[in-house]
UniProtKB/Swiss-Prot annotation:
CDD domains per the UniProt record, alphabetical: PncB_like
Enzyme class at the top of the EC tree: ligase
Protein function: Catalyzes the synthesis of beta-nicotinate D-ribonucleotide from nicotinate and 5-phospho-D-ribose 1-phosphate at the expense of ATP.
Keywords attached to this entry: Ligase, Phosphoprotein, Pyridine nucleotide biosynthesis
E.C. designation(s): 6.3.4.21
Post-translational modification: Transiently phosphorylated on a His residue during the reaction cycle. Phosphorylation strongly increases the affinity for substrates and increases the rate of nicotinate D-ribonucleotide production. Dephosphorylation regenerates the low-affinity form of the enzyme, leading to product release.
Cellular component annotations (GO), alphabetically ordered: cytosol
Lineage, broadest ranks: Bacteria, Pseudomonadati, Pseudomonadota, Gammaproteobacteria, Enterobacterales
GO molecular function: nicotinate phosphoribosyltransferase activity
Protein name: Nicotinate phosphoribosyltransferase
Amino acid sequence: MTQFASPVLHSLLDTDAYKLHMQQAVFHHYYDVQVAAEFRCRDDDLLGIYADAIREQVDAMQHLRLQEDEFQWLSGLPFFKPDYLNWLREFRYNPAQVCVTNDNGKLNIRLTGPWREVIMWEVPLLAVISELVHHYRSPNAGVDQALDALESKLVDFTALTANLDMSRFHLMDFGTRRRFSREVQQAIVKRLQQESWFVGTSNYDLARRLALTPMGTQAHEWFQAHQQISPDLATSQRAALAAWLNEYPDQLGIALTDCITMDAFLRDFGIEFASRYQGLRHDSGDPVAWGEKAIAHYEKLGIDPLTKTLVFSDNLDLPKAVELYRHFASRVQLSFGIGTRLTCDIPQVKPLNIVIKLVECNGKPVAKLSDSPGKTICHDKAFVRALRKAFDLPQVRKAS
């Protein structure tokens, strides 16, 4: 296989905003914590043939650094502190932290090192894998086909919402990690900027260059790591929620609910957390059932749901977002994050269903037990059983 002609990535900021948000919190609170993360392809795609090309891109990433104009732009945002930004200015990717192998056609990737550094690999590495694979599989597809597909979807969207008050509909681009390419994501986002309901992107590089609002708070790994950082497994989720508020007391306050199922989350999400966090993010399970649970929980606590925001981001497309908007718009604030269905929605192109997830913290196992059984990730079945027991969950799902 011929190697990719040039580096896929051109900016340290070509990543999701929540990576920097979490990295700052790790820098301040968990500087010496060590982690391991692993790549997983949820489909049967045999991606091992791309291992050499991926390794070449990983090696090229060590040359990325925060540029002066990027540093100044980040300095103007309200939640970054000077000590972290000065450290980030010196940050370089360390390719020695990444082991990429072809295991009889299966792509294996394992990341190890300090959490403050390893945290940066996931999103750009997934974007690299996605772009490389699509480059070889669909060499004739690109920006034109992506924009044509988007225009068709926008025509349908306009018809679907013709009789709706769309003043409270807010859409965000969450498409970095599984995009067809960097150029396609930029073209899609620039087109969506023309729509009044488009409010921002999770990609810090695009947000800076296109003068958009960067979107994102924290990911599953924040909660997973606390399973070993916290001295008590049963209180680890509350410890994660409290530590986030310690770093960001009055901003970036959307909490992810499905690291250990929504029901377990709500048991930990008492009046103080519910009051201080601005809202919740859905990332697995039935979105309507989840939203109803969230609203009922706020009401039970005496909190007006209209003062809170629900963010939906699980496998969304525009019609699904409209359906959820119809259902919830009069009862709660809403935002919708769409990823693959925007940035890799091209006829005859199959998006990759790929993730990189934390599997260890300080040498011990961590797990994600989401509201979708197929998304459960952990090597250690004994730890999964312990986690389920600690959070009073039935012992029914197997770790994948």
